């Protein structure tokens, strides 16, 4: 501010939804169980909404260690980029131990994360190797690689086309390619181009769910955009 810079809140609306829900229910006297990964920025951001009364669980075993001050008002929220299957297992453990727990009205896991995980479940059995385009620090990209591995399909993650290693493709006839929710399309196209250089002869897109949800730009950016039209 001292240098005249402007800040814009570009937090994903799906993450903001979790923050709003936590703040609202906290005022009503609720404690929380949060399903997520310790140290993940989103988890730290959500837990940072409250001074206390929010318990992080990373797996079903952690659920048994939770000791809330009271159980009459207990709610559960999740990190938006979790593995759908892992989150479901942990949620079942939460409901088994705390049958009265309040669940989100709509699931917290990002629709783009879920769509990609559903797609990789269909893709993995059909290919010899899976390449995931995404950052090694991206939770949802790592989950895609994990899902492929559960199907016994060798899987690798690259942040850039230059990271592709030819030895990954030796003896492989069919290559599956997917990308994390925040990976820009240009990176995917660059990986495809590199695969062609390494011998790929055709590219086929599998039918999947068409994502039509669009979120508006942050308010300040919308105003700037209109000013330049």
Where are these regions (language model features)?
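The feature marks the mature, well-folded catalytic cores of soluble enzymes
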Residues: 1-179, 185-226
């Amino acid at each position: 501010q001292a240098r005249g810079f402007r800040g814009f809140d570009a937090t994903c609306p799906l993450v903001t939804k979790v923050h709003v829900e936590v703040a609202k229910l906290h005022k009503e006297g609720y404690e929380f169980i949060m399903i997520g990964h310790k140290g993940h920025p989103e988890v730290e951001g959500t837990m940072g909404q409250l001074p206390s009364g929010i318990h992080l669980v990373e797996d079903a075993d952690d659920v048994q260690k939770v000791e809330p001050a009271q159980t009459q008002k207990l709610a559960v929220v999740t990190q938006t980029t979790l593995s759908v299957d892992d989150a479901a297992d942990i949620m079942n453990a939460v409901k088994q131990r705390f049958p009265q727990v309040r669940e989100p009205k709509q699931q917290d896991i990002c629709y783009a994360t879920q769509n990609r995980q559903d797609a990789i479940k269909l893709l993995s059995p059909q290919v010899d190797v899976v390449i995931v385009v995404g950052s090694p620090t991206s939770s949802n990209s790592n989950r895609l690689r994990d899902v492929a591995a559960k199907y016994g399909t060798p899987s690798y993650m690259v942040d850039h086309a230059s990271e592709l290693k030819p030895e990954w493709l030796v003896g492989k006839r069919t290559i599956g390619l997917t990308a994390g929710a925040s990976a820009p399309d240009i990176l995917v196209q660059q990986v495809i181009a590199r695969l062609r250089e390494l011998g790929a002869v055709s590219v086929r897109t599998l039918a999947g769910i068409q994502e039509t949800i669009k979120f508006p730009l942050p308010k300040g950016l919308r105003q700037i955009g209109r000013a330049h039209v």
